[in-house]
Amino acid sequence: DFTDVKGHWAEGTLHQAYDDGILKGYDAKTMAPNRSVTMVQAVTILCRVLHVTGLGDISQFEIPQDAWYAQDVAKGVYAGLLEEQDAQVLNDPIPRGQAFILFGQAFQVVGAQPDLSVLDQFPDTAFLTGEQARAAAALVEAGIVSGSGGALQLDRPLTRAEFATILYRLADQYIPAAEYEGHIGTGSVLSGDAEIVGRTVGDLWFDQSSSNIHLTDVTASSVTIRADRL
């Protein structure tokens, strides 16, 4: 057991993230739940969750080929999570506002016209860019984030515990599609080929390992397909 998880406000989520292979221990005894997440760490985890295998062009990032994160950055570029302008902040702690954008891009939860009025309750959202405002509004409206102390604290670095919490509020099940039998929860990320018949479910995300998907008489809150081999 990790010594710094017991009694933590996100204890259950942290254990689940570890069991699911989403988060790893910081060392043999700790998970460092209050430690900040860097941009490249966030992208690496999201690409792991979505089983991204394609590699984008990272020649403009000037990353040493032997850097541990070189392939993860290439996956992030391929998945549309990273752009050239992010090259200078890959190893910086990711602010909560930027993390909201990443989650929105990864799970495609930001609609064309989200209700921006939901941000009026937070005094620190008045000067957001359009992209930041849309991502924050979509997550607030969906009940994924609610702020702390009356504010969204968009400039504060996101912690590992917060990252796991937002992730599991978006989707709390990560399984092969062939094993899917319906799920009542926040959502499911499914990998591989799928044939789902006669189910009423929440949100479904098919990751980039899916290539053959058949849905018959399925009622879902939303269905997002990130596969590129259909």
Residue spans of the language-model regions?
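Feature responds to low-complexity, polar/acidic, surface-exposed segments characteristic
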Residues: 1-11, 19, 24-97, 103-133, ...
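Catalytic cores of secreted/periplasmic or lumenal enzymes
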Residues: 136
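Short, T/G/N/S-enriched strand-turn elements that build extracellular solenoid repeat scaffolds
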Residues: 178-198, 202-230
